[in-house]
Amino acid sequence: MGKLVGAPKGHDRYRDPKTHQITPALYRVRAPFFWRNTIALFAVSSIPLAVYLYTFKKMGDDDLGDIPIPPISDEELQKLKLEYENQK
């Protein structure tokens, strides 16, 4: 196994060795890909956003009226209310 010392050759021209900030050369290298990457970001992020909005709309339209509620006696209801008040 070889030793790795320092940054790989050729990569030091893209960062300032003292401040480690991006140099104008790296901006020039990245420039052709900026708009393509931006469009890809919007395309990929629109899929989960569309799923979320569709689900939110469908759940908002549902009144849940078709779900049967089991009958409960008045005695049982009073017991549950008492338990609820005691838990507070």
Swiss-Prot record:
GO terms for biological process: mitochondrial cytochrome c oxidase assembly. The keyword Membrane applies. The keyword Transmembrane helix applies. It is a single-pass membrane protein. It comes from the Eukaryota. Disulfide bonds: none annotated. It is found in: Mitochondrion inner membrane. One of its GO terms (cellular component) is mitochondrial inner membrane. The chain crosses the membrane at residues 33-55. Its main location: mitochondrion. Residues 1-32 are mitochondrial matrix. Keywords: Membrane, Mitochondrion, Mitochondrion inner membrane, Transmembrane, Transmembrane helix. Residues 56-88 are mitochondrial intermembrane. Component of 250-400 kDa complexes called cytochrome oxidase assembly intermediates or COA complexes. Required for assembly of cytochrome c oxidase (complex IV). Belongs to the COA3 family. This is Cytochrome c oxidase assembly factor 3, mitochondrial.
